[in-house]
C-alpha cells in the first residue's frame, strides 16, 4: 500500500535504514532560485528566440468550464496545413503541434488558423548558420499573442412563471423511463384480457 496523506502508517515494519530514505523538501527555496537562473540562462542561450512555443486557443472540457477558452497543447495538422505550413517546419519556428487533438468545430479551427497567420506575419526567421542581427528578444510568445476570453452577449428577459416545477418534470421523466417496460406490459396484458372477454 502506498503512503499518502498525513495519516499514521499501517503495519510500519521498516527496515533498510529507512531514516536515510525519508524524502524532505528543505531545498524548496533553492530549487526556485535554480529554476529562475535556468530560465535566464536559457533565454540568453536561445536569444532572440522566445522561451515558449505558440499554443492554440482551445475550449476547456466539461460542462462546468466549457464557457472559457485557454491555451491548448498544440495545433492540429489540419490547422497547420490551412495556414500553409507543414508540421515538421512549424515545430522549427516555435509552433507547438499536437498529433492527437481533433478539430470538432469550424469556429475554433478558423480562429487558430488566423492565430497562426498572425504569428507568421510577425515572426522573423534567421538563417541557421548565418549571422544573427541585433534584435529585441521577445521572452514570452504567450504574452505577445495573448488568449482573450470572448465577450458573452446576453439580454435581460422577463421572468415567466408558467406554474411548472423543474423538480416535478425531472421526477416524472425519471419515473417514465424507469417504469416504461412494466407499464407497457400491463397495458398489453389488459388489452389481451379484454380481447379474451370479447371472445
Curated annotation (Swiss-Prot):
PROSITE patterns hit by this protein: RIBOSOMAL_L13E
Example of a GO cellular component annotation carried by this entry: cytosolic large ribosomal subunit
Keyword RNA-binding assigned: no
GO biological process, one term: translation
Key words, A-Z: Ribonucleoprotein, Ribosomal protein
Region (Disordered): 178-199
InterPro entries (alphabetical): Ribosomal_eL13, Ribosomal_eL13_CS
GO molecular function: RNA binding; structural constituent of ribosome
Similarity comment text for this entry: Belongs to the eukaryotic ribosomal protein eL13 family.
Name assigned to this protein: Large ribosomal subunit protein eL13
Organism ancestry: Eukaryota, Fungi, Dikarya, Ascomycota, Saccharomycotina
Amino acid at each position: 500500500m502506498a503512503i499518502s496523506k498525513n495519516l499514521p502508517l499501517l503495519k510500519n515494519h521498516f527496515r533498510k535504514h529507512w531514516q536515510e530514505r525519508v524524502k524532505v523538501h528543505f531545498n524548496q527555496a533553492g530549487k526556485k532560485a535554480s529554476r529562475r537562473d535556468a530560465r535566464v540562462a536559457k533565454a540568453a542561450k536561445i536569444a532572440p528566440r522566445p522561451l515558449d512555443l505558440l499554443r492554440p486557443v482551445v475550449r476547456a472540457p466539461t460542462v462546468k468550464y466549457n464557457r472559457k477558452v485557454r491555451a491548448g497543447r498544440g495545433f492540429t495538422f489540419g490547422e497547420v496545413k490551412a495556414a500553409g505550413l507543414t508540421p515538421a517546419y512549424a515545430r522549427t519556428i516555435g509552433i507547438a503541434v499536437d498529433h492527437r487533438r481533433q478539430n470538432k468545430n469550424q469556429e475554433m479551427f478558423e480562429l487558430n488558423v488566423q492565430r497562426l497567420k498572425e504569428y507568421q506575419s510577425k515572426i522573423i526567421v534567421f538563417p541557421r548558420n548565418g549571422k544573427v542581427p541585433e534584435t529585441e528578444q521577445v521572452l514570452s510568445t504567450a504574452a505577445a499573442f495573448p488568449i482573450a476570453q470572448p465577450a458573452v452577449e446576453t439580454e435581460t428577459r422577463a421572468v415567466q412563471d408558467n406554474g411548472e416545477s423543474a423538480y416535478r418534470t425531472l421526477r416524472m421523466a425519471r419515473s417514465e423511463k424507469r417504469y416504461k417496460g412494466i407499464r407497457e406490459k400491463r397495458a398489453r396484458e389488459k388489452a389481451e384480457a379484454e380481447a379474451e372477454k370479447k371472445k
